[in-house]
Amino acid sequence: AMKKKSWLGMALSGLAAGKWFWWGKDAASFKAIWIAMFDYFKAQGLDNLIWVWTAETGDEDWYPGDQYVDIIGSDIYSKDVETCASRYVAISATYGNKMITLSECGSVGKISEQWAAGARWSWFMPWYDGEEEDGAPIVHADEAWWKDAMGQSYVITREEVPSME
């Protein structure tokens, strides 16, 4: 047991339905692993975990179930504002009782423009810049994107989150 209560987000097995990783073999196996991990952590007394499931288009059969998921995430790369907003709307229509997050993103429309278009992400996490094998730069969130995001009244930083004690 923890002496001081804090919260930890568990974004397990991202991009499962994409079949890029070993946990993406099939929906039944993925759900069995997710539920087994959920039950194990709960049995160990870890009641402060926030379970984040990453949705992909057309993967509803991979969803572990409302009792095992707290927040629905979406990973979006190289998409315009309209695409991001339509993805938010689609997830909201399917999982309307859950918070929705932009769990990974890169080269997407500005947060202010997404918000205006109806994408009310609970949080967002841009992937950091890097470079291609040939040395060409990959920019996922440039300075203008960050200034826009941090300049919005509805965006708060970790330092601004109220204490849960």
Locations of regions flagged by a protein language model:
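Substrate-binding cleft of secreted/luminal carbohydrate-active enzymes
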Residues: 98-165
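Surface-exposed cleft-lining segments at the edges of enzyme active sites
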Residues: 15-28, 74
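N-terminal catalytic cores of secreted or lumenal carbohydrate-active enzymes
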Residues: 1-3
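Alpha-helical scaffolding segments of alpha/beta enzyme cores, especially the outer helices
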Residues: 29-40, 86, 90
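Alpha-helical scaffolding within the catalytic cores
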Residues: 54-63, 82-90, 106-115
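Substrate-binding surface in catalytic domains of secreted glycosidases
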Residues: 74-100
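Aromatic-lined carbohydrate-recognition surfaces of secreted/lumenal glycan-active proteins
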Residues: 7-17, 34-60, 97-108
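Aromatic- and acid-rich polysaccharide-binding/catalytic face
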Residues: 59-81, 125-127
